Amino acid sequence: MKPVLRTSLKDEIFRGNLLYVEGRFYLIADDVQEAPNCFMTHATPCLHFVKVSRKVNPQTDKFGFAVEDTGERLHPLIDNFPAVLTFSGTMADAKNQAGAYFADVIEVKLQGNHWTDEIKTGDILTLEGNPGEYEVVSWIRDSLTAKQKGGVLTIQARRKP
């Protein structure tokens, strides 16, 4: 059961805010209406935690040769950040054939802030409790207004083979 949050217009809750209620994180992924007759907005539960890392190339010496024992490694950008996850695969159907759902593409919604601003295409995304890795293929930063700096960062990532 979703908790009911009672707020006023003075609380300054915006799209992209994270709320922590009764042991669970919620992301305000919809626009919050500021008119007195339009108080309702939806808080989506963050059921997953994500980690985002970036591949760092090996170090080289002044001649351009790789220094020993500094192979390619992952540099963590975000660790255990609450997120909303959906699978955004495609349906493939034709006459007399069953549709196939390809679940190798995920869509992750995160709070837009100075940590998530660092995410780029090609970064590696992992889900807590899931051994697979996903590569960020696109991202969209939306819902910025004149009153706020946050917003929602929507990432599409493809499962790595």
Where are these regions (language model features)?
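Short, conserved turn/kink motifs that form compact alpha/beta structural patches or helix kinks used as
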Residues: 1-154, 158-161
